Amino acid sequence: MTSIADIRTDYARASLDIADVDASPLRQFRRWFDEALKAEVAEVNAMTLATVDPHGQPSARIVLLKNLDERGFTFFTNYASHKGEELAANPRAALLFHWIGLERQVRVQGIVEKVSEAESDAYYHSRPLGSRLGAWASEQSSEVPDRATLEAREAEYRQRFGDAPPRPPHWGGYRLLPERLEFWQGRPSRLHDRLEYRKHADGSWTIVRLAP
């Protein structure tokens, strides 16, 4: 049986230098994201979202990036879920993208805000019917006795709304407004390249190199 301690990979695909990156962290992220798309990285828009509850207990889960613009990173969820409750109490959060095939990570820290009703409506109505009904049927993070209960709820809302369910008031989008972004490139001998963008009050960014 292989020892977990003996599992290791040496990274050697690429390097990362301040002279080669974009002055804008969001443009740099888009550059890396497009390269991950081209490389056919699985679930390229999957990201770990970390939040903290009022007692200081952190939580993390995978969510999907659904929009990226000059303001930040957008994802959608149930506002009444554990993460929604935690973000209501403390809007500070972090994201992590891990594109293992490219030996890259991107870490993002910032403040989360709800997107507009119009943005939530537009994305909700672009989803498959089953996903739209599921947003009604699932009281996310609450206890349920069995799967049959969920399926019965889905059938109930399908009968009620047909193929035109409205967006539930408890479901919508969040946008993380980045204040720090770290781009990590795996390198040999664990001497990885780490570049961090730090946002200033005037909206400008400073780029620094961090020790691995």
Swiss-Prot record:
Protein's name in the database: Pyridoxine/pyridoxamine 5'-phosphate oxidase
User: Which residues participate in substrate binding?
Assistant: R8, T9, D10, Y11, K66, Y123, R127, S131, R190, L191, H192
User: Which EC number(s) are documented for this chain?
Assistant: 1.4.3.5
Please give the SUPFAM superfamilies that the UniProt record associates with this protein: FMN-binding split barrel
- What Pfam family is a match for this entry? PNPOx_N
Which residues are recorded as binding FMN? R61, I62, V63, L64, L65, K66, F76, T77, K83, Q105, Q140, S141, W184, R194
One Gene Ontology term from the biological process aspect of the record: pyridoxine biosynthetic process
Q: Which PANTHER family match?
A: PYRIDOXINE-5'-PHOSPHATE OXIDASE, PYRIDOXINE-5-PHOSPHATE OXIDASE
Q: How is the cofactor bound?
A: Binds 1 FMN per subunit.
Top-level enzyme category: oxidoreductase
> What HAMAP family does the database record attribute to this sequence?
PdxH
Q: What does this protein do?
A: Catalyzes the oxidation of either pyridoxine 5'-phosphate (PNP) or pyridoxamine 5'-phosphate (PMP) into pyridoxal 5'-phosphate (PLP).
Keyword flag Flavoprotein: yes
